[in-house]
Amino acid sequence: LGGYGMDAYWAYVCSKDIPLRYSDFNIGKELRQNEEAIAERKDWIGTDKGRLNLLMADQCDGIVTGLYEYWRCYEPFFPEKTTFIPFPIVIGKEPNIPQETPEKLNLFIGISKNRSAYKGTDIMLRAAEKVKKDFPDKLNLKVVTGLPFDEYVRTMMGSDAIMDQLYSYTPSMNPLEAMNHGVI
């Protein structure tokens, strides 16, 4: 079984046991009440789909999780068969990273239109916009919305750093792709 994202264990454990300081479902001991978190809890906890996920996890031979936070949700229930294997990146040619410090930081943030609050990009965008306002001569800010992954990667090129998910502990695909190209 693959534990790679939204499922019954992720929704239940982060809403009930709360082993992480923050997640898609909690900040501290408080449950997040944004639209996406509420909808995902309703979709996975105590539903046929959620029960199927529980059954599959119980009956499978092994569970592979792709992020540390997903491992935290499966491992307490299935310590003998839960394994964390980080998401891979395909290493291409070595990125060209300039040795000199740029005059302006080129900062990139990609926004998923309907998932901004859920991912925390709304908070990061406000912070970046404040820095841009306070230090316009120090920051170039590129904001994109709703791009397919290939276009996202092309648009990100030339950036020094990206802002991605506020509530994630481990790099997901966008930051891994960025690091592969020498972008922080």
Functional labels for PLM-detected ranges:
Residues 83-119, 125:
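Conserved donor-binding/catalytic core segment of Leloir-type glycosyltransferases
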Residues 153, 175-180:
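Short alpha-helical segment that forms part of, or immediately flanks, the ligand-binding pocket
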